[in-house]
């Protein structure tokens, strides 16, 4: 009897592999504790208190706007100094100065430095390594740009934050969140600043800068309760694509991340969904997440994975950055390295004329479905230049395909182009690994300019199934180019062929889409605010409406979208929005985290100084919602008087 029982036990323990214990980076083990707060003078403890332990002074967060420097309610210099002293390193609290201050009258004006900065301005590294700069300066409000690029007259902070915490530990993040929440200060998170809509900036804010959280750990065999057993990588919130791909390659694996070299993988990218050169094979980056470590709005540091905070885990995989908390690290699945073949080619209308040019483009569009069914990803642009138009494939990316197979995929197209008498000089290369292919094929992308608005649309597979559908979709794209707009597009299918897609917050429109197309409208750099608004209106409600009209019920990718996207809740999340909003209300009822067009952001708006859509102003409640929101906040504040003053 006894023998029998123990052998059953043994068999059971062999079958059920124990799941992974919580593995924290060193910087995640340095945390703020209640025990520590209890040792501080009460006045200081109040500044940094956790939400469930202490409630801010009455009415503080119930004012119409977040406090702003010089409004009389902004925390005193003394309070900021106290914050600085509690952080894990002495220089972690930064009072930012825009880089281009060297170009304007003032104490640090320096013509030589200004020239160097101007020469380097469009290089994205110039901005990523800075605590406040963002890659879409239009949404910072265009103050303090190098004058030969955009003369802003003087150098003010504009949409940049008032203070930045260069976060090096979980402690720093907890202190920042608690301080901002308790003192009515707007909070923003900047990782790399790649966000298309300026979500990583904000005037009069305290910014948590996650860029330096760079740790990476590899697991040979990660065991997750969701059923996954296999290689995995845990990476810090500040890890960028070039660093993650290198680390993966060092261990002979690949991970699903973006094409851009400098994008911050574990910040806005993965939380917003994340498309990848591997998406037609492995889905969206968010589909591959096993767990997040996160500091929530209360200041608590916790895990969101398949067994812990499951609702938060669901929301963080596609629900968008800057909304539910500050993620400190993410664990993702990894897959074996594979060979990749990539191709690039281009042609333009100069010698062949527009009709042949468009016939060549059309021959490619006609095969979108066939190509992605072979797990390929292609990245192409169609750019007008005066009377001419250029098509550039850069690159066509065929993961796990040999030169021969990839050549078979493309040869029919090249034959068609030859038949159309369109000269091309294609380059086809087989790489031994994804890492080599990615490094060689994707150039460093520049910072975006000071006079363009971008928008995007997901085009469903069904649009390309019939000739009528292809005519209509192709017509809409062609019309935009003929109207002078560039198209930057991706042919991919991030629907998992094998095993189905995990249930998460990724925009359902991605699942049946095979084209993600981005376009932009430029305006004259000297345009008045009114002219810019008019140009934007005709872009958002004119051109982009034509794309919406041919893709009814679909949506747009929130990470590469128009800041003025109408009906963004449906567009970015479709039928998942209601559930996301419920999770937001539950984890962040006081809107400690706010970003434009983020889940639950409806009640607030940035009142910019120039009336343009940007971060250059106070964050205030939308007037109609004040009374209800305020009473909701008061109701929440009342029942928790823990400390007696
Ligand atoms: C050149 C370029 C190439 C790109 N390539 C791709 C691509 O291949 N695939 C793709 O899907 N997208 C791509 N994007 C879009 C990209 O996904 C978004 O710009 C994304 O927001 C970048 O995230 P980030 O953290 O680097 O940027 P940031 O601008 O720093 O942050 C973006 C948002 O996430 C929030 N956030 C950042 N870190 C955290 C955190 N730790 N916790 C919580 N919230 C956080 C910020 O507050 C902000 O709201 C590209 C963008 C650019 C400019
Ligand atoms: C708090 O708000 C209530 C209602 O608006 C007001 O009557 C009260 O005077 C405020 N208290 C403080 C300290 O501002
Ligand atoms: C760009 O910046 C680098 C330092 O990051 C500097 O060495 C270089 O001179 C700058 N380039 C130009 C053209 O000034
Ligand atoms: C900066 O210039 C703008 C526009 O000319 C002006 O409105 C603003 O008052 C100036 N700010 C400062 C601090 O001089
Ligand atoms: C999920 O998170 C909890 C809490 O950190 C942890 O105990 C558990 O092991 C995690 N599960 C997996 C599979 O990692
Ligand atoms: C890659 O190709 C090999 C050989 O054709 C195949 O066995 C393997 O399943 C492929 N991997 C993926 C992820 O498709
Ligand atoms: C891929 O697209 C090209 C260009 O349209 C086409 O010629 C080719 O047939 C497609 N591949 C497959 C497998 O259909
Ligand atoms: C598609 O467009 C072509 C060229 O304009 C036209 O000849 C063809 O009849 C159209 N097909 C359908 C089904 O509308
Ligand atoms: C587009 O039209 C809608 C509805 O008329 C309007 O609310 C919105 O402000 C317009 N968008 C822009 C950018 O003008
Ligand atoms: C909201 O109301 C306040 C006064 O209560 C006013 O100053 C502000 O301009 C209004 N904001 C908008 C966007 O109408
Ligand atoms: C290798 C491979 O998957 N080839 C497929 C490419 O797509 C065409 C059309 O869908 C299929 O017929 C091939 O089998």
PLM region spans:
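Fungal secretory targeting signals
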Residues: 1-23, 645
């Amino acid at each position: 009897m006894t023998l029998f029982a123990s052998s059953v036990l043994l068999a059971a323990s062999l079958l059920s592999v124990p799941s992974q214990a919580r593995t924290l980076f060193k910087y995640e083990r340095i945390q703020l504790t209640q025990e520590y707060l209890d040792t501080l003078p009460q006045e200081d403890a109040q500044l940094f208190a956790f939400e469930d332990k202490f409630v801010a002074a009455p009415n503080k967060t119930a004012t119409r706007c977040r406090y702003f420097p010089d409004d009389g309610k902004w925390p005193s210099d003394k309070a900021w100094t106290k914050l600085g002293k509690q952080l894990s390193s002495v220089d972690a609290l930064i009072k930012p100065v825009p880089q281009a201050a060297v170009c304007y009258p003032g104490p640090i004006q320096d013509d030589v430095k200004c020239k160097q900065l101007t020469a380097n301005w469009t290089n994205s590294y110039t901005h990523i390594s800075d605590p406040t700069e963002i890659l879409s300066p239009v949404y910072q409000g265009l103050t303090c740009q190098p004058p030969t690029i955009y003369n802003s007259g003087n150098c003010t902070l504009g949409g940049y934050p008032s203070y930045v915490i260069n976060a090096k530990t979980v402690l720093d993040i907890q202190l920042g969140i608690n301080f901002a929440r308790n003192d009515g200060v707007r909070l923003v998170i900047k990782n790399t600043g790649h966000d298309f809509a300026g979500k990583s900036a904000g005037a009069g804010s305290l910014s948590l800068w996650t860029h330096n959280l760079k740790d990476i750990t590899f697991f040979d065999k990660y065991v997750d309760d969701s059923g996954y057993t296999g290689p995995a990588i845990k990476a810090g919130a500040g890890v960028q694509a070039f660093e993650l791909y290198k680390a993966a390659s060092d261990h002979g694996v690949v991970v699903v991340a973006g094409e851009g070299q400098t994008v911050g993988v574990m910040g806005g990218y993965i939380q917003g969904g994340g498309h990848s050169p591997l998406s037609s094979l492995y889905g969206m980056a968010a589909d591959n997440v096993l767990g997040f470590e996160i500091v929530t709005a209360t200041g608590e540091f916790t895990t969101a994975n398949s067994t812990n905070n499951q609702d938060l885990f669901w929301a963080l995989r596609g629900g968008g950055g800057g909304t539910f908390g500050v993620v400190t690290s993410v664990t993702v699945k990894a897959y074996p390295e594979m060979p990749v073949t990539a191709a690039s080619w281009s042609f333009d209308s100069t010698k062949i004329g527009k009709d042949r040019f468009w016939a060549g483009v059309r021959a490619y569009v006609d095969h979108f479905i066939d190509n992605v069914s072979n797990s390929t990803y292609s990245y192409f642009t169609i750019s007008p230049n005066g009377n001419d138009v250029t098509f550039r494939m850069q690159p066509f990316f065929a993961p796990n395909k040999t030169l021969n197979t990839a050549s078979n995929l493309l040869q029919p197209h090249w034959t068609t182009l030859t038949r159309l008498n369109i000269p091309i000089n294609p380059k086809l290369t087989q790489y031994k690994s994804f890492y080599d292919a990615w490094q060689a094929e994707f150039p460093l992308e520049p910072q975006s300019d000071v006079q363009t608005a971008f928008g995007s649309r997901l085009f469903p597979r069904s649009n390309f199934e019939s000739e009528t559908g292809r005519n209509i979709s192709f017509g809409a794209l062609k019309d935009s180019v003929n109207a002078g707009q560039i198209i930057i597009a991706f042919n991919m299918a991030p629907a998992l062929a094998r095993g189905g897609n995990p249930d998460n917050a990724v925009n359902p429109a991605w699942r049946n889409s095979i084209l993600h197309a981005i376009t932009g409208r430029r305006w004259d750099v000297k345009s008045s605010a009114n002219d810019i608004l008019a140009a934007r209106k005709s872009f958002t409600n004119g051109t982009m409406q034509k794309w919406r009209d041919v893709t009814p019920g679909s949506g747009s990718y929130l990470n590469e979208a128009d800041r003025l996207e109408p009906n963004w809740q449906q567009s970015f999340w479709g039928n998942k929005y209601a559930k996301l909003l419920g999770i937001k209300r539950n984890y962040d009822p006081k809107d400690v985290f706010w970003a434009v067009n983020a889940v639950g952001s409806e009640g607030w708006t940035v009142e910019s100084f120039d009336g343009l859509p940007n971060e250059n102003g106070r964050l205030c409640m939308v007037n109609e919602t004040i009374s209800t929101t305020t009473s909701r906040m008061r109701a929440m504040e009342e029942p928790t008087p823990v400390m007696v003053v």
